[in-house]
Amino acid sequence: ELIDLGGEISKVVVGVVTECVPQEGTHLHICKVDCGEYGHDIQISTGAPNVYAGMHTAAALDGSTLPGGVKIKAKPLMGVESNGMLCSGEELGLNDDLYPGAEVYGLLDLPKDTVPGTPIQQVVGLDDYIFDISITANRADCQSVLGIAREVAAVLNKPLKMPATDYTVSDYVDSRLSISVEAEDLCPRYIGHYVRNITPGESPRWMRRQLALCGLRSISNVVDITNYVMLEIGQPMHAFDMDALESCQILVRRAKDGEKITTLDEKEFTLTPNNLVICDGSKP
């Protein structure tokens, strides 16, 4: 399936608020908005608390469409004609991973160099497409970008270009970390690498965006890298903080009946022996 990221949005453009006047007795502001070729003096009312004169934002004009099939029509608000709607990031289907600042309370505040009348898809990165490919359970080898590329190369009889790698192997991890596998029927092999001198922090925007488009939420640079590589080559990975591992040990085993685990998104799950867990010296 080919998904048009901005396909549900129509007639939403960059608008510059040239005038912003409070409407007496209401929480609204009556704005004059420059939308380039669509009109330089369009009157739109908004209740957003962060609106200001000079703001560049997303203007949904009369007859426009927003995600979810929402139709915008010119109509009076508190007795004053409003010829559209000024939009928040959420109303455009955005979050901070897709476009920084999208989750701010109020209107989407765009850079001052954005040109009035420009389709909003071009400004916030929604002028793009996603290939959504359904993979059957017996083709786990295709559940990655590399896997799909390998399949396409085979079908078209073309050479496969492998991802570039550049790394140096130092001492073996055995000297720092003990790894053992009890449930070999579920996990025939488990490999660990020890990486030093890492500073946890926020991932770059391009990586957060790529993960979001694949349905994953950005957590930190370390976690995001493991997820990004998993999507690229199909190898599931997890990063552990060595300082938090009890006894510097990793054990792969079946879960105990009723054992509980809390995931990175703070959700708790109750496990059964049919579940596989990765533990440190004492717990999953």
Task: Briefly describe each language-model feature range.
Residues 1-169, 173:
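Phosphate-backbone binding interfaces of nucleic-acid-interacting proteins
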Residues 16-44, 209, 226-284:
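Conserved mixed alpha/beta core segments that line enzyme active sites in large multi-domain catalysts
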Residues 44, 76, 93, 135-142, ...:
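Hydrophobic alpha-helical scaffolding
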Residues 48-57, 137-154, 215-241, 281-284:
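Conserved phosphate/anionic-ligand binding catalytic regions in large, soluble enzymes, centered on
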Residues 70, 74-92, 172-179, 186, ...:
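Aspartic protease
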Residues 116-135, 174-213:
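Residues forming anionic-ligand binding surfaces in small-molecule and nucleic-acid pockets
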